[in-house]
């Protein structure tokens, strides 16, 4: 069995595509896997920052701040935000003089 499914052959009218065994279960499975792979790749590229940040930091929002004064909570939030802001930059700007 050949994995080649389409053969272009010259005819009097031009080039024709003859598909053989297009109902083969292996070809159908490969097509479905290929389409799913393409969809997952597109979603990954669209949402990579959100997905990988979630994997890196987990689903937790951080340690509990119960019983901690509001000023310390705000300081902690600012520290966490600065860490996330640093993580957002994938590119480094280099200025040449």
From Swiss-Prot:
It is found in: Virion membrane; Host apical cell membrane. GO terms for molecular function: monoatomic ion channel activity; proton transmembrane transporter activity. Residues 44-97 are intravirion. It comes from the Viruses. The record marks 41 as: Seems to be involved in pH gating. Its main location: virion. The keyword Ribonucleoprotein does not apply. The chain crosses the membrane at residues 23-43. Residues 60-81 are annotated as: Disordered. Keywords: Disulfide bond, Host cell membrane, Host membrane, Host-virus interaction, Hydrogen ion transport, Inhibition of host autophagy by virus, Ion channel, Ion transport, Lipoprotein, Membrane, Palmitate, Phosphoprotein, Signal-anchor, Transmembrane, Transmembrane helix, Transport, Viral ion channel, Virion. Forms a proton-selective ion channel that is necessary for the efficient release of the viral genome during virus entry. After attaching to the cell surface, the virion enters the cell by endocytosis. Acidification of the endosome triggers M2 ion channel activity. When the channel is activated, one or more imidazole moieties of His-37 probably become bi-protonated. This is Matrix protein 2. The lineage of its organism: Viruses, Riboviria, Orthornavirae, Negarnaviricota, Polyploviricotina.
């Amino acid at each position: 069995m050949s994995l080649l499914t389409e053969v272009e052959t010259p005819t009097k009218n031009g080039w024709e595509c003859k598909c053989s065994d297009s109902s083969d279960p292996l070809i159908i499975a490969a097509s479905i896997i290929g389409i799913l792979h393409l969809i997952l790749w597109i979603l990954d590229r669209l949402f990579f920052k959100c997905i990988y940040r979630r994997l890196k930091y987990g689903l937790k929002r951080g340690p509990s701040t119960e019983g901690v004064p509001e000023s310390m909570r705000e300081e902690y939030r600012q520290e966490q935000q600065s860490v996330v802001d640093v993580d957002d930059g994938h590119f480094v700007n280099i200025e040449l003089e």
